[in-house]
Design a protein with these regions (language model features):
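Helix-turn-helix DNA-binding elements, focusing on the entry/boundary residues of the two helices
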Residues: 21, 32, 43, 57-60
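Short alpha-helical DNA-recognition segment
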Residues: 29-47
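Short, basic-rich loop-to-helix N-cap that marks the start of a DNA-contacting helix
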Residues: 52-65
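Alpha-helical residues within the helix-turn-helix
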Residues: 26, 37, 65
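A short, Lys/Arg-rich alpha-helix, primarily the initiator
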Residues: 2-27, 76
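Short, charged recognition helix plus adjacent turn
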Residues: 3, 74-92
Length: 92
């Protein structure tokens, strides 16, 4: 299983996201054309994302909605970042 935490660079993270989108698309037995139509994203954008890992945030969100993964975005940046052990202890 690919986790984003295992990745080291922005390019690695983008590649992992593109791979996940491709896998989810194939699990749902959708062609690139079908997913692009369902998401309202150009076919070229989807192909570029799956091949070159380049996509706008807006298009990525549209693909996520079309694939039923939009709730994953609610988790993004939702956890509080701690800068010291004392901050963790103070919350208890």
């Amino acid at each position: 299983m690919i986790t984003l935490l295992d990745q080291e660079t922005p390019d690695d993270i983008a590649a992992a996201l593109a791979q996940r989108v491709r896998m989810r698309r194939k699990e749902q037995k959708l062609t690139q054309a079908q997913l692009s139509s369902k998401a309202g994203v150009s076919l070229g954008s989807l192909k570029r994302f799956e091949h070159d890992h380049q996509i706008s945030l807006q298009s990525l969100i549209k693909l996520s909605i079309a694939l039923g993964c939009e709730s994953d975005f609610s988790e993004l940046f939702s956890k509080k970042g701690y800068y010291s052990i004392q901050e963790v202890l103070d919350e208890r």
